[in-house]
C-alpha cells in the first residue's frame, strides 16, 4: 500500500508543479483557483491562515497581499519560516494564541 501511494505521489503532476514553482504544497494551486474565481484576498489585506502547515496557502496569501499586507499563520505543528509571514505554533482556540495572532495583524 505504501509503495503504491509513493509511486502515485511521485507521478502527481500537481506535486511536481508545486515543487517546480517553489510552493510547499500542491494545495497552493487550489487557493490560486479560488482567488482567481472569487478574489477573496486583495492587495494590502491582513490574512490569518489557521492550520497553515506546511505553508502553501500562506505563500500564496503573501503573493496576493503584497508589501502592504500582512499574513499570520497558526498551526499546531511547527512550520518552516516563510519570508513575509509571521508564523506561530499553537491552538488558535487558545485565547493567548489568538491575541498574539491578532497583534501581528
Give residue spans per PLM region:
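Conserved Rossmann-fold cofactor-binding substructure of NAD(P)-dependent oxidoreductases
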Residues: 96-101
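Conserved class I S-adenosyl-L-methionine
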Residues: 44-53
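Conserved small/polar residues in nucleotide/adenosyl-binding loops
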Residues: 103-105
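Conserved SAM-binding motif I beta-strand of class I
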Residues: 70-74
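Conserved acidic residues
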Residues: 91
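Conserved SAM-binding loop of SAM-dependent methyltransferases across substrates and taxa
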Residues: 54-66
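Class I SAM-dependent methyltransferase Rossmann-like catalytic core
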Residues: 2-42
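Short loop/helix-cap segments at secondary-structure boundaries that form the rim of catalytic
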Residues: 78-85
